[in-house]
Amino acid sequence: MSASEGMKFKFHSGEKVLCFEPDPTKARVLYDAKIVDVIVGKDEKGRKIPEYLIHFNGWNRSWDRWAAEDHVLRDTDENRRLQRKLARKAVARLRSTGRKKKRCRLPGVDSVLKGLPTEEKDENDENSLSSSSDCSENKDEEISEESDIEEKTEVKEEPELQTRREMEERTITIEIPEVLKKQLEDDCYYINRRKRLVKLPCQTNIITILESYVKHFAINAAFSANERPRHHHVMPHANMNVHYIPAEKNVDLCKEMVDGLRITFDYTLPLVLLYPYEQAQYKKVTSSKFFLPIKESATSTNRSQEELSPSPPLLNPSTPQSTESQPTTGEPATPKRRKAEPEALQSLRRSTRHSANCDRLSESSASPQPKRRQQDTSASMPKLFLHLEKKTPVHSRSSSPIPLTPSKEGSAVFAGFEGRRTNEINEVLSWKLVPDNYPPGDQPPPPSYIYGAQHLLRLFVKLPEILGKMSFSEKNLKALLKHFDLFLRFLAEYHDDFFPESAYVAACEAHYSTKNPRAIY
């Protein structure tokens, strides 16, 4: 129903007003606001009443609310004094509940109190309010009664709405190491200037990288934990805080983080992580015709052979881990990215524009089908796997645990910790991010099985924006960002293994031919 059908409105569209907090569970305060729209609504008894669409100054448009006429006041000096009085009461009430001043949790209150005249006192507020109109007096009495009740009870807030408000005001930053920033620039240069593509499927895919990181993280956490009992040797036996694990040492949180990265990557890759020149390649490698299902008998035979021979802890049979070197193309080696390249810093964006089709692939230029073979020599293993193998030998056939005992004997409080820690490490070393039967043989594998570190790194450019649209408590967000930081350090430490220049090839050689599709385990 429109606003021009005879009903008289006290306020009009576009007028600057003061409006009460629309949520009855929150503190009774007045906000600076503006009327966006006016309509005729109905109350609970079906009577026609005016309703106003209110925009609160400084708030996101998503917080615009419809309010009844009795929730809106004119922008006058008297109502401004009432606004300041309610703001002071609300802040005092929050302080009395033990909340920090910097976390006032009342948007708009700080700006109201900043404009408070120094000579204005509570007594003057009472005197000025007593001379107001009858309508204002009635409102003042109701507000005073409600304020008195609120002062005796703790302010209750809806956690979900409060978290959303805080997230809108929070800026999330993920620091990317310098060596990885340069990798992002080189990646942009190779794709957009040199018209190269990352050869797919990657030799070390994202599943392998994430699983390797969890094992790397767990091993480092366990070895650093060995020193902890020495410093807490004098703690009393009854103290149960010895079981506390900091977020940056928590393996379960690390597993949740990498699983979240996997899910986020699979979803966002086609939306925001591909350059326009890569769109056609993505459609090809994710088609059902590109990958052929593996025969169950061949798979079981291959895995049984792998189980009989010792292997590094991070070479997981469930993920593609080819040891074939990149095929030579006959072209000169790809040069380094030129400096001061203006297009090398362009941002990632989604585009429906397809890149130009490759020239026809000849049989001689088609990449051979890589075969899974066992890592029987250290020369075929990346530096990361060699490093972890030397640091933590895994005796899969031996019942003796990994030696994790500190040099000094600990107290009885920590006597049972070593066995538990050893079991946890052995469990983590056999842990897999996805089950063996995923993805099903009749379905194309998800992007995390095909793409590698080059595209995973791009995700961290977009993560602050993605996280800004999610609801996290301050504590959980801080822990998550800490784990992101540790993971980026891991990528930076082994960037020579994860980001080889040979990964970028000509567009016509950027994927295996459909005649010889690459096996996905």
From Swiss-Prot:
Keywords on record: Chromatin regulator, DNA-binding, Intellectual disability, Nucleus, Phosphoprotein, Transcription, Transcription regulation
| Tissue specificity statement from the Swiss-Prot or TrEMBL entry | Expressed in many tissues including liver, pancreas, heart, lung, kidney, skeletal muscle, brain, and placenta, with highest expression in skeletal muscle and heart.
Question: In this protein, which residues make up the domain named MRG?
Answer: 168-517
Disease in which the protein is involved: Basilicata-Akhtar syndrome: An X-linked syndrome characterized by intellectual disability, global developmental delay, progressive gait disturbance, poor or absent speech, facial dysmorphism, and mild distal skeletal anomalies.
Top-level taxon: Eukaryota
Compartments in which it is found: Nucleus
Q: What is the effect of changing L308P?
A: In MRXSBA; uncertain significance
Q: Where is the composition biased (Low complexity)?
A: 316-329
Impact upon substituting F56A: Abolishes interaction with histone H4 monomethylated at 'Lys-20'(H4K20Me1)
Provide the positions where the record notes the PTM Phosphoserine. S309, S311, S367, S400, S407, S411
Q: Which organism is it from?
A: Homo sapiens (Human)
Q: What is the lineage of its organism?
A: Eukaryota, Metazoa, Chordata, Craniata, Vertebrata
Biased-composition ranges for Basic and acidic residues?
150-166
Which biological process terms from the Gene Ontology are attached to this UniProt entry?
positive regulation of DNA-templated transcription; regulation of DNA-templated transcription
Q: What is this protein called?
A: MSL complex subunit 3
Q: Which residues carry this modification: Phosphothreonine?
A: T405
Q: Where is this region: Disordered?
A: 114-166, 298-409
Q: Could you describe the subunit structure of this protein? A: Component of the MSL histone acetyltransferase complex at least composed of the KAT8/MOF, MSL1/hampin, MSL2 and MSL3. Interacts (via the MRG domain) with MSL1 and KAT8/MOF.
Q: Which GO terms describe its cellular component?
A: MSL complex; NuA4 histone acetyltransferase complex; nucleoplasm; nucleus
Q: What else is known?
A: MSL3L1 gene undergoes X inactivation.
Identify the stretch(es) annotated as Required for the histone acetyltransferase activity of the MSL complex.
290-440
